[in-house]
Amino acid sequence: MNVIEGVVATPNARVAIAIARFNNFINDSLLEGAIDALKRIGQVTDDNITVVWVPGAYELPLVANVLAKTNRYDAVIALGTVIRGGTAHFEYVAGEASSGLSSVAMNSDIPVAFGVLTTESIEQAIERAGTKAGNKGAEAALTALEMINVIKAIKG
């Protein structure tokens, strides 16, 4: 039986981070967590990390797609925060961001890590950006690194 598992130490990985500016008071913490995980745990160098700011979570799939198509990156990490309000806007933005990023991953053959918080409140978002519930930006970075190695192992 063959078992393929990825490791997170990936010193030569080239990683792009697409991050939404909207809700940046939360997203800045997600970015800090992602960069810390890439550098400290993944051993990725500054030169191999590219950060691209976009207006909001809805724009993340387009930019992730463009980044993936450049063939300059081994993975893309998407970071953002969508907080439920009093209208259906939350469902549209969260759903399209999720489905769009999934589509990019499926069509590009590189990992697209989903670090977009979809929360009921600002408090929940803050908890997931580095307080009570860990840092989902760091988790997305570790997912991206592990998936880079899983895909490399599968392809041989």
From Swiss-Prot:
Protein task: Catalyzes the formation of 6,7-dimethyl-8-ribityllumazine by condensation of 5-amino-6-(D-ribitylamino)uracil with 3,4-dihydroxy-2-butanone 4-phosphate. This is the penultimate step in the biosynthesis of riboflavin.
Encoding gene (name): ribH
GO cellular component: cytosol; riboflavin synthase complex
Catalytically driven reaction(s): (2S)-2-hydroxy-3-oxobutyl phosphate + 5-amino-6-(D-ribitylamino)uracil = 6,7-dimethyl-8-(1-D-ribityl)lumazine + phosphate + 2 H2O + H(+)
Subunit structure: Forms an icosahedral capsid composed of 60 subunits, arranged as a dodecamer of pentamers.
GO biological process, one term: riboflavin biosynthetic process
Binding of (2S)-2-hydroxy-3-oxobutyl phosphate, residues: G86, T87, R128
Protein's UniProt name: 6,7-dimethyl-8-ribityllumazine synthase
InterPro entries hit by this protein: LS, LS/RS, LS/RS_sf
Biological pathway: Cofactor biosynthesis; riboflavin biosynthesis; riboflavin from 2-hydroxy-3-oxobutyl phosphate and 5-amino-6-(D-ribitylamino)uracil: step 1/2
Pfam families (alphabetical): DMRL_synthase
Family: Belongs to the DMRL synthase family.
Enzyme Commission numbers on file: 2.5.1.78
Residues forming the catalytic site: H89
Signal peptide: none
Keywords: Riboflavin biosynthesis, Transferase
Residues binding 5-amino-6-(D-ribitylamino)uracil: F22, A57, Y58, E59, T81, V82, I83, F114
GO molecular function: 6,7-dimethyl-8-ribityllumazine synthase activity
